[in-house]
Amino acid sequence: MTSKLINFITIEKERFEDECVKFIKNVITDSINSRNIATIGLSGGSTPKPIYEMLGNDSSIDWTKVYFFAVDERYIDKSSKDSIYDLISKSVFKNRENLLVDHFITPNTSLPLKECIETYSNDLKKLIEKSNGSPDLVTLGMGEDGHIASIFPNSPKSPLDETDLVYHTTTERFAIFDRITTNINFLASSKNKVFFMSGSSKKKVWDEMESSQINVSRWPAHKIISSGNTNVFYRE
C-alpha cells in the first residue's frame, strides 16, 4: 500500500500531546469558520487520554459549536472506567459538564443492545446531517491485532459489506466481549482522519499493515488510508 496517502509524523515525547491538540484544534477552527459547527469522532485508549485532557483545558475554543461522538463503545455501564464515555466525560468535558448531554453523542448502553444500536444510529445521523453528511474529523488507533474502532480483523463479514451505520461486534481477544461500532465506510468518509500511535510494538504492526497488499478484512485501516486525508502522529 502506498505511503503517499498518509501524512506520517514522528514527534518527540515532550511535544506529542501539544502537536496532536494543535491538529484537532485547527480542524475545529476551520470547521466552525466554514459551517459554524464542528463534528469530531473520538476513539478510546491510553495514548489519546492526555491529548483529550489537554484539549479539554483549552478555553479559546467555542465549545458550544463543537459536537463529539463515540467512534465505538464497549457494551458496558457508561460509568465503567473501561467505557469511552467515562474517558471523554472526564477529559474533554471535565470543565464543561453542562454541555455533555447535548454535545457528546454516545450509545446509551443501559438500553437493550438492539435498541441501543438503533437509538445511537438515529442520533448520529441527525448530528451528521448538520455537517454536510460526514464528520470533520475522526481520531483512531490501531491495536496490535490490527483492529480499529471495534472493527476486528478477519470477521465473518467483511467490514466493507456492513451497511448499517452502527452495528454490534464481538471479540474474544479482549476482556469486554460485546462492542458497538460505527462502520468503516462512515469513518473513511470523514473529512479528516488521524491515528494516534505510541511505542515500537504499535509501529511494527503499522509497518506490517502498510507493507501488505490491500485487504480490508485483515487490515481495516487500509480503507481509511485509501480514502485520503489521513494523518498519523507517532510517538516513539
UniProtKB/Swiss-Prot annotation:
Annotated CDD domains: 6PGL
Organism lineage string: Eukaryota, Amoebozoa, Evosea, Eumycetozoa, Dictyostelia
GO function terms (MF aspect): 6-phosphogluconolactonase activity
Pathway in which the depicted protein is active: Carbohydrate degradation; pentose phosphate pathway; D-ribulose 5-phosphate from D-glucose 6-phosphate (oxidative stage): step 2/3
Entries under Pfam families matching the protein: Glucosamine_iso
InterPro entries for the chain: 6-phosphogluconolactonase_DevB (IPR005900), Glc/Gal-6P_isomerase (IPR006148), NagB/RpiA_transferase-like (IPR037171), PGLS (IPR039104)
This protein's UniProt keywords: Hydrolase
BP GO terms, sorted: carbohydrate metabolic process; pentose-phosphate shunt, oxidative branch
Gene Ontology CC entries for this record: cytosol
Family: Belongs to the glucosamine/galactosamine-6-phosphate isomerase family. 6-phosphogluconolactonase subfamily.
Annotated protein name in UniProt: Probable 6-phosphogluconolactonase
Keyword Phosphoprotein among UniProt keywords: no
Catalytic activity: 6-phospho-D-glucono-1,5-lactone + H2O = 6-phospho-D-gluconate + H(+)
Assigned EC number: 3.1.1.31
Role description: Hydrolysis of 6-phosphogluconolactone to 6-phosphogluconate.
